[in-house]
Every structure is written in C-alpha cells, then in structure tokens.
Amino acid sequence: MCRLYAIILIVLVMNVIMTIIPDSKVEVVSCEDCPEHCSTQKARAKCDNDKCVCEPI
C-alpha cells in the first residue's frame, strides 16, 4: 500500500512540474497569427493542418 501512495505522489509531482515548465517548442498558434509569430523568429510562415509551422529561411 505504501508503494501505491509513493507512485501516486510521484505522478502528481511530475504533473505539477510539467505544468510549471511547459515544453517551449510546442506553441499552438492559429493560422491567422502565424505570419506575426514566425516573423519574430525570422522564419517563413506555413500552415499545416490548421497549425502554424515556422520554417527557417
């Protein structure tokens, strides 16, 4: 039973860490905002399945 509580505690801590430190590469940007978003990264805007993809110039 103690192991079960330890596993649950570890999972909860990992969830909190992932919430606090999100993956910086994953940014959901709509196609309308894509050109502005990619211009800040000096990249070319491209929409792929309604997701913004910035291609290096």
Swiss-Prot record:
Mod. after translation: Contains 3 disulfide bonds.
Subcellular location: Secreted
Predominant localisation class: secreted
Tissue: Expressed by the venom gland.
Pfam families for the chain: Toxin_6 (PF05453)
S-S bonds: 31-47, 34-52, 38-54
InterPro entries: Scorpion_toxin-like_sf, Toxin_alpha-KTx_8/9
A single BP term in Gene Ontology: envenomation resulting in negative regulation of voltage-gated potassium channel activity in another organism
GO CC terms of this entry: extracellular region
Secretion signal span: 1-19
Propeptide: 20-28
Domain of life where this protein originates: Eukaryota
Keyword annotations of the record: Disulfide bond, Ion channel impairing toxin, Potassium channel impairing toxin, Secreted, Signal, Toxin, Voltage-gated potassium channel impairing toxin
GO molecular function: ion channel inhibitor activity; potassium channel regulator activity; toxin activity
Notes on the domains: Has the structural arrangement of an alpha-helix connected to a beta-sheet by disulfide bonds (CSalpha/beta).
Function noted in UniProt: Selectively inhibits voltage-gated potassium channels rKv1.2/KCNA2 (IC(50)=331 nM) and hKv1.3/KCNA3 (IC(50)=503 nM). Partially inihibts rKv1.6/KCNA6 (IC(50)=9983 nM).
Family, as annotated: Belongs to the short scorpion toxin superfamily. Potassium channel inhibitor family. Alpha-KTx 08 subfamily.
Additional record remark: Negative results: does not affect the following channels: rKv1.1/KCNA1, rKv1.4/KCNA4, rKv1.5/KCNA5, Shaker IR (with inactivation domain removed), rKv2.1/KCNB1, hKv3.1/KCNC1, rKv4.2/KCND2 and hKv11.1/KCNH2/ERG1.
Name of this chain's protein: Potassium channel toxin alpha-KTx 8.8
